[in-house]
C-alpha cells in the first residue's frame, strides 16, 4: 500500500473488492477498512525513554542495516535495530544519566569500531559493538558533551577528547 505524498495523516478509508471468477463458487464482496497513515513505523516511537542527546546511526554488527545508538536519563545506553528492537547485548547499564552523544572509533586496532560516551557522574565508557564493556575512565564532573575522536599525535592510535562540567 502506498499513499500520495500530499495525503493527510490519520485514518484513510479503503474500499476492498473481492471477486472470484470460479463458475462453481462465484463470490463477490466489498469491504470497507481503514488504514492509519502516520509518520511512525514498526517499533517506533519508543516510549518511556527520555533522550537528551543526538543518536548515532551506524551499522556496527555488519548486517548491512544501520542501527540506532543513544543514551538516556534512565542510565542506559541503547542499541536498537531498524525495527526498534533492542540489539543483543543492549541496553548497557551505565548507572547514571547519559546526555552525551556517542562517537565511534577503533580504539583497540581490531578493525571494528567501538562506541564511546560519557555520563552525568564523569564516567567515560567505551563499548564494543555487541554492548560489552571495552574500557571506562573516570573524570571529575559531568560529561554533557559528545566526545571527539582523532589521532592527535600521528601515532596511528585514536585519542578521545572530552570535557566535563568542571572544566576538566
Set out the residue ranges of the language-model regions:
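Extracytoplasmic/lumenal domain signature
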Residues: 21, 25-168
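Accessible peptide chain termini
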Residues: 1-2, 131
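Short glycine/proline/serine/threonine-rich loop/turn segments at secondary-structure transition edges
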Residues: 5-14
Amino acid at each position: 500500500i502506498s499513499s500520495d505524498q500530499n495525503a493527510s495523516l490519520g485514518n484513510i478509508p479503503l474500499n476492498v473488492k473481492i471477486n472470484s471468477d470460479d463458475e462453481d463458487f462465484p463470490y463477490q464482496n466489498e469491504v470497507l477498512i481503514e488504514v492509519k497513515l502516520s509518520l511512525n513505523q514498526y517499533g517506533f516511537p519508543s516510549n518511556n525513554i527520555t533522550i537528551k542527546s543526538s543518536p548515532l546511526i551506524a551499522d556496527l554488527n555488519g548486517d548491512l542495516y544501520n542501527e540506532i545508538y543513544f543514551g538516556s536519563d534512565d542510565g542506559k545506553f541503547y542499541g536498537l535495530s531498524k525495527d526498534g528492537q533492542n540489539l543483543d547485548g543492549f541496553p548497557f547499564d551505565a548507572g547514571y544519566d547519559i546526555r552525551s552523544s556517542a562517537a565511534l572509533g577503533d580504539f583497540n586496532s581490531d578493525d571494528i569500531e567501538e562506541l564511546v560516551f560519557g555520563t552525568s557522574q564523569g564516567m567515560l565508557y567505551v563499548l564494543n559493538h555487541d554492548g560489552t564493556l571495552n574500557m571506562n575512565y573516570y573524570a571529575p564532573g559531568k560529561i554533557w558533551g559528545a566526545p571527539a575522536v582523532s589521532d592527535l599525535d600521528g601515532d596511528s592510535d585514536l585519542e578521545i577528547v572530552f570535557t566535563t562540567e568542571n572544566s576538566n
